[in-house]
Amino acid sequence: MVDMAIFKATYTTTATSAKASIRYIAHRRGKDNAKVTRALWGWDGKMERREAYQMVDEAERGSIFFRFVISPDPATEDTRRDLFLREITEQTMLGLEDRLRRQIQWVAATHDDHAPHRHVHVLAILPKKLQVHDLKALRHIATEAALQQRYQRDNALEQAQEHGKEQPQWELHH
């Protein structure tokens, strides 16, 4: 069995709980219980907490507020703790939009300071509950994005190392 990215999902139907989730992802205490404020971000880059709250307040009636955690496998995907988690998150959320055939609003924060596995918390506003097959598809999308990025980063590192070894050899001959 191939290790896969961890993709957890829970949901709420209340704006109050959604806002509590935003506070949590922005202000969860860091390592050694240190107070930390993390940047919130979405499709358009950095987002202020008041903007995230406004997004929740303006959600269509009946919206479902999904909380996702996207965490590349540290043993096979984020082996060097160097993956661009924002890119993986954006690819995953784009996959969700494709499945739902509509744009969705979401806010995220990267948590890379309090656990051995780096991860991203996302609060997404959806028109309906997701089914098990949707969640499995999102996990697959996150895994593929992480593995592809791992391959590209390892390839680039390998080429840089080879180039670095060849360069002194070339200099010796000229």
Language-model region placement:
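N-terminal nicking endonuclease/strand-transfer module with a His-rich metal-binding environment
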Residues: M1-H174
